[in-house]
Amino acid sequence: MRKPDSVAALTEFGRVRLSKSFFMRDFLFSDIAAVHGLSNVPDDPDLAIAAGSRLCEELLEPLQDRFGRIAIRSAFRSCEVNGLGNEMQAAGRGGYNCASNEANFAGHIWDRRDAQ
C-alpha cells in the first residue's frame, strides 16, 4: 500500500481493520500533529499495518476480552511528528514527551524496524 496522500486515501487507510475491534484510524490521532499542522501517517503503511495488527491481536484484544471495551486515542507517531516532539522536549517545552526517533522505532513509530 502506498503512503496516503489524499483525503480519500487517508480515509481508506483509516478503515483498515487491524483486528476484530480495532481499525487503523483508532491509532492515528496526535496532539502534536494537530497543533503543529503535521501529517501523522506512516511512510510504510504495510509495515505499520503489520505492527498494529500484532499489537491489537496479541495485546489489546485479550485485554479487552478480559476487562471490557478499550478506547484508543493515539498510538502511532510518524517520524516527523515524533522528531518534533523530541526536539520540543529537549528544548524544555512542556507537554512533549517523545524519545528520539531511533529509540521509538518499532515503538510509537510502527513503520520503522528497531535494531533487533
Predicted regions and their residues:
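N-terminal, Lys/Arg- and Ser/Thr-rich interaction peptides
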Residues: 1-45
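Cell-envelope/glycan interface and biosynthesis
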Residues: 27-116
